[in-house]
Structures are given as C-alpha cells and as structure tokens.
C-alpha cells in the first residue's frame, strides 16, 4: 500500500503541495532527507524545527508501515545558488515572525480600531469576550443592568497558521491549546503561529438612550462589525440608526456578523440572512460579507478574524503631521487612602489621530477647564504611555492608548475630559462656542419604532451635537440660505473639517436626524 505526504502526522494539503513542488514528492524521500537540506529548500512555513518534526514523523510512518525506501534525495534537487544579479522570491518576502519572538510583538501598539455596533443585546460584548477574553462591561451599573453604558475597549493579537491557512486571535489559540502543546502554536496542527498585527476593539452601547455615546465611539473606528441577532427580525431600530451613524462617520470597511445562530434553526437563520441582505441593499454595507456566528460557542470566529485581515486594513500612519489625540475616557487611577507621595497623575485614554508623541513631551488639552465664563486650556507633560497592561515609549496612530499625565487626578476623574482634543502647545484649533453648519438631513427618523419624516431645523430649536468624542448642546440661532448658525454649550475644540452628528428630541428621546459640515 502506498502512502501520500498528507498521511504524515502534521502535514496538511498545503504543505504537501509545497514539498512536492520542491522535489520532496514521496514519504520515502521525506524520511531520508537531512534536516539542513530540507530547511535549505526555503519552503514557506518549514524552518529547522518544523523540518525535524516532519522528517521524524515520516520515518515513523516508514517503520510502522514497512514502506520500501529509495536512495536519499539527490543533492541536485536543492535549488542552485542564484546568479549574482538574479533576484529570488525569498529576498522579496518579509520573514514571518513566529514562536517565542511573538512574545514581544504582542506588547506592541495596536494598529487599528475596530468598532462593534448594533442593536442592544445582539451580542457585541459577548463577541469581544470570545475574541479577547475581556468582558468590556466593567462598571457596576453595566453589570447590574446587563447592557453596555460606556464605550468598552479591548485589544487582540491576530495570528496566522500557514499549515491550516487560518487566522485566530492569541486568546483563541491559548484557550484551545491542548495539554502539553507549546505556546504560540496552532491548536489544530501544532504549527508555529505567525504574528500579523495587534488591533483594538471599541464596543459601542446599543440602547436607544445611549446613541450619543455610540456616535462618539464611531469617530475612533477604522472599520466596524455590525452585529445582527439571528433570533430577531432584521432590522431592529438601533440597527438602522447605527448603520447610518457609520455612514455619517465615513466608515466603509464593514463586516456584518449574524450572531446567535445557535439559538435558531437552519431555516430561521436563512430567513434572517435574507432580511439582512434586503436591509443593507443600497447602503454602505451593501457589499459587506455576512458571517454566521455563535459568539457563545465560538462558531466561525476564525472567519471573523480572517475578515478583519482582508477587509479592515490598518490606516496609514501620518507620523510627520502635528500630533493630535482625541480623548474618549479620563480617570483617576489612585485608590482611596493613597499617600500623597505615591499619588499618580490623571490618565486620559483615546486614540492618536495623527503624528506621534513620546514620554516627557509637553501637551495641551483643549477646551480645558471652565474658569468663570471662559475655558482655560490645560498644559502638562506625559508621564507614561500604555496600551492595556503594556507600557510604550511612543504613541502613534492606531489602537487605543492611555496617556499618564502630571495633571491633578481630580481634573480627569469620572470621564470629565471626554471629547477634549490633545496636541502640542499652540498647535490646536481655536475653542469655538458657535459654528456655521451646512446641514444634511435624513429622509426619515431612525431608531424609532414609528417611521416619520425628518422636519427642517427651527429657530431656537435645541439639538444634541456629537463631534469626535465630544457631546454638546446646540441651539439654532440663525437660519441662512444654505446653512445654520448654531451656538454650542459647552464650547468645543474639534479637528478641522469635522462632521457634526445631529440629533433632536422625538418622543422624549434624542434621535439621529442628520449631520452637518463646518463652514468657515
């Protein structure tokens, strides 16, 4: 009986094809080749340790099955040295980072932010938990009520198995690792995993009363997952509202997650899939992939991670531009009773929009704190830079970052600086208390059970405006031919060319009705 390379333990179809292409086309040849000869063939995914494993497993198969062996693989099957000016494929490829080298790369800063949006209780926080191991509902009220109230944050490392041609997160690999299996190896085939990148998740609340919080989170996202529960009719009110929010924020890299497929039959899942396709027709998510998932049981999470790599690319880093940082959280990390000499300065969390910053540099925070009737910018120095439990020397665009400062922690506690803009002194835009907006209204009110037409803005009407991560009250002061003059309270400092999401009170709730572009 003859055996194929795929019969050797640990060798899959892809690796077998690579071996055949290199001249190692039988189990006998593999069992006789020397380790250095096999590794010198430069076959993707086969280093010295992997070569030794494959050769030993081939020898075991030969001995157990009594396969007749042939003379050792001839030396001429190894590729000859290229001519002096000849370019080879291997010189172009960047050597993948594997094994123990992953330990340091996992500590690197995340490269992009992926948002999770959708209707309340459709499984956004559960999906983050399945991918990262973190439960982002950390606050007591969130845990008591079972819903996300604040923006949740978590980080993940994306890894790749060349043998299985599959993607997974570091947490997924660790939780699936079998007893005795080495770290940083594929739980399915034991192949050493390759590092791809670190990413951050922004878990946005889905409840209707927290729409403004969701809008502020959208400003941090480079791409998004729109979660739709398979056990409910699609679309639900906040599913509509969140998709429009992504449109306003200009987020086009979207993945649709059809969650909770474990709770429905095959027929119900297919019916729900049809509803999703009909819902997104003609929207920015029209061509988005729809991935059926069970976040609770971990079904198809590998397809989700693959979609991250294929659809939501890391943004280009604009390191040479003036540093700007958008604050999404601020807090006091000191425990009650901490001695004065042991107190830490206030911490601000958010994302770098452009440029870079290092420990020890001076920064300015605008609008800052209120002094009588005006706002006074804050100036301080950066004492530390962190992402999760990892400390960094420099912060750059991509991922969610914590900046430790020399500020009195009383100024940062309780998210008091959310929405403020950070930069080097005297480089930030002016603080404004009035803005002229070119307004684009939606045809119909989103997020409400009852569909109704959006009416034009009225003089002295009160609005809720969200720009970046800042939420501010607006009052329509003047109605011009093609724009509106709106007063802002509190004043804001926003990046140039910002988009203002506009909501008005409808049936005692703020509903998204459109967006405005700043003029002048």
Spans of features found by a protein language model:
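Compact, charge-rich alpha-helical regulatory domains located at protein termini
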Residues: 1-79
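C-terminal effector modules of nucleic-acid-centric enzymes and ribosome-associated factors
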Residues: 113-116, 264-266, 409-520
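Conserved Switch II/interswitch segment of TRAFAC-class P-loop GTPases
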Residues: 196-200, 204-210, 219-241, 249-270
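Conserved catalytic-core segments of large NTP-driven translation/proteostasis enzymes
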Residues: 96-97, 105-106, 110, 278-417, ...
């Amino acid at each position: 009986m003859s055996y194929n390379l795929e019969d050797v333990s640990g060798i899959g179809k892809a690796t077998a094809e690579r071996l055949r292409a290199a001249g190692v086309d039988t189990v006998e040849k593999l069992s006789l080749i020397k380790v250095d000869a096999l590794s010198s063939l430069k076959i993707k995914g086969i280093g010295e340790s992997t070569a030794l494993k494959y050769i030993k497993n081939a020898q075991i198969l030969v001995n157990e099955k009594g396969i007749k062996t042939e003379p050792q693989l001839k030396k001429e099957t190894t590729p000859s040295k290229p001519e002096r000016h000849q370019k080879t494929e291997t010189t172009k490829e960047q050597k993948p980072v594997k094994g123990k080298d992953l330990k340091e790369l996992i500590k690197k800063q995340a490269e992009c932010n992926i948002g999770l949006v959708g209707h309340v209780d459709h499984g956004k926080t559960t999906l983050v938990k399945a991918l990262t191991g973190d439960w982002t509902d950390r606050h007591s009220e969130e845990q008591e009520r079972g819903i996300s109230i604040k923006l949740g944050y978590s980080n993940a490392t994306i890894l790749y198995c060349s043998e299985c041609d599959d993607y997974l997160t570091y947490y997924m690999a660790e939780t699936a690792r079998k007893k005795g299996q080495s770290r940083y190896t594929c739980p399915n085939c034991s192949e050493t995993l390759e590092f791809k990148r670190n990413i951050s998740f922004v878990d946005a609340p889905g409840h209707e009363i927290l729409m403004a919080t969701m809008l502020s989170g959208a400003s941090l996202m480079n791409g998004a997952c729109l979660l739709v529960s398979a056990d409910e009719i699609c679309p639900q009110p906040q599913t509509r509202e969140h998709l429009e929010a992504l449109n306003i924020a200009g987020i086009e890299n979207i993945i649709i997650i059809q969650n909770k497929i474990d709770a429905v039959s095959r027929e119900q899942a297919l019916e729900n899939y049809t509803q999703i396709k009909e819902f997104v027709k003609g929207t920015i998510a029209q061509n988005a992939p729809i991935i059926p998932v069970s976040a609770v049981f971990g079904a198809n999470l590998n397809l989700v991670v693959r979609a991250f790599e294929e659809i939501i690319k890391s943004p280009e880093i604009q390191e040479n531009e003036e540093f700007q940082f958008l604050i999404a959280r601020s807090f006091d990390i000191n425990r009650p009773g901490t001695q004065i000499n042991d107190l830490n300065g206030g911490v601000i969390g958010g994302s770098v929009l452009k440029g870079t910053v290092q420990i020890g540099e001076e920064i300015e925070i605008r609008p800052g704190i209120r002094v009588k009737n005006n706002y006074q910018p804050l100036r301080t120095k950066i004492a530390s830079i962190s992402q999760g439990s990892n400390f960094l020397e420099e912060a750059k665009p991509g991922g969610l970052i914590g900046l430790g400062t020399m500020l009195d922690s009383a100024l940062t506690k309780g998210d008091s600086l959310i929405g403020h803009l950070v930069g080097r002194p005297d480089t930030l835009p002016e603080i404004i208390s009035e803005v002229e907006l070119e307004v684009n209204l939606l045809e119909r009110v989103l997020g409400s059970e009852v569909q109704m037409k959006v009416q034009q803005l009225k003089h002295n009407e009160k609005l809720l405006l969200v720009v970046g991560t800042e939420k501010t009250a607006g009052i329509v002061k003047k109605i011009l031919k093609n724009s509106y003059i709106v007063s802002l309270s509190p004043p804001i400092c926003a990046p140039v060319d910002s988009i203002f999401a506009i909501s008005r009170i409808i049936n005692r709730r703020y509903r998204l009705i459109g967006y405005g572009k700043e003029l002048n």
